[in-house]
């Protein structure tokens, strides 16, 4: 067995490397709907989200779509005297399962029938971080460069207005902040290290202002998803304060996570689409060692 496959159990190896199939109704995730996301058990690449999982009655985990358009590859499979469409992971080329055209019509009509043994599950509160650090274009671009981060979405959170638009949030009356939702692999990077990146990539002593952006929607904030995340943030902030790391007091707020509303599509991955766009962050810091 290759070195990067030595961590696999027998069934994980047979499924991902030899295209075996698990027994229906007797596998780990067939009836699990805990919020979170699923990674390739071989490589750790992001494959599926729990929000896209549904009960198909087939006895294997079923998803209406992959986590993003290029998360998986599909190929013709003529084994067992059948014509099917096989699903494999893009980077590790792991066999995952098959996709069929009998999924829920309201979800697009597809059913990704996936072996549990090909997946590693990360619970939402263990692999998700919500931060606000000024203009979300820059914050997104920074965290996309951090090793262990799987996906970053920009959006709005922290307020009470339902389904806000960018125009709504710009008024400063919604209570929402421009924020990022980060999915990360806790086996690669810890939440504490993400916090350290957060405090490094913006000015947490500047009240409602980052760069040229001013207003409560540009506040410095950590939106915690669990008591553990809250405690880790409080501990790190206390350590920084005690060590005099910053010349002024921290103004970062600790807020319990509320609904996160993804921003309009043109805001997503903005600085990749618009390389000359406004950025208040030194992006190179994302790849430099933490203190």
From Swiss-Prot:
Pfam families: PMSR (PF01625), SelR (PF01641). Residues 127-284 are annotated as: Peptide methionine sulfoxide reductase A. The active site is at residues 113, 135. Gene3D superfamilies: Peptide methionine sulfoxide reductase, Peptide methionine sulphoxide reductase MsrA. In the N-terminal section; belongs to the MsrB Met sulfoxide reductase family. Has an important function as a repair enzyme for proteins that have been inactivated by oxidation. Catalyzes the reversible oxidation-reduction of methionine sulfoxide in proteins to methionine. This is Peptide methionine sulfoxide reductase MsrB/MsrA. It comes from Treponema pallidum (strain Nichols). The gene is msrAB.
């Amino acid at each position: 067995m290759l070195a990067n496959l030595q961590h696999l159990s027998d069934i994980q190896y047979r499924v991902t490397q030899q295209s075996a199939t698990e027994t229906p109704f007797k596998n780990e995730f067939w009836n699990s709907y805990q919020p979170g996301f699923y990674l390739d058990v071989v490589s750790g690449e992001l494959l599926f989200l729990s929000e896209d999982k549904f009960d198909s009655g087939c006895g294997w985990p079923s998803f209406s779509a992959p986590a993003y358009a290029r998360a998986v590859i599909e190929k013709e499979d003529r084994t067992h005297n059948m014509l099917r469409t096989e699903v494999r992971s893009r980077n590790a080329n792991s066999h995952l399962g098959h996709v069929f055209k009998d999924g829920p019509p309201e979800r697009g009509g597809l059913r990704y029938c996936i072996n549990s043994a090909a997946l590693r599950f990360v619970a939402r509160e263990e692999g998700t971080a919500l931060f606000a650090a000024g203009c979300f274009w820059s914050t997104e671009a920074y965290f996309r460069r951090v090793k262990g981060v799987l996906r970053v979405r920009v959006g709005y959170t922290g307020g009470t207005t339902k389904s806000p638009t960018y125009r709504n949030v710009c008024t400063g009356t919604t209570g929402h902040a421009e924020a990022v939702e980060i999915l990360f692999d806790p086996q690669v990077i810890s939440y504490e290290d993400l916090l350290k990146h957060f405090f490094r990539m913006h000015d947490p002593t500047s009240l409602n202002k980052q760069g040229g952006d001013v207003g409560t929607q540009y506040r410095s904030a950590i939106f915690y998803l669990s008591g553990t995340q809250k405690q880790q943030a409080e501990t790190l902030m206390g350590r920084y304060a005690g060590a005099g790391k910053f010349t002024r007091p921290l103004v970062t707020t600790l807020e319990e996570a509320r609904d996160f509303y993804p921003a309009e599509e043109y805001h997503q991955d903005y600085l990749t689409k618009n390389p000359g766009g406004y950025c208040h962050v030194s992006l190179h810091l994302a790849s430099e060692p933490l203190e």
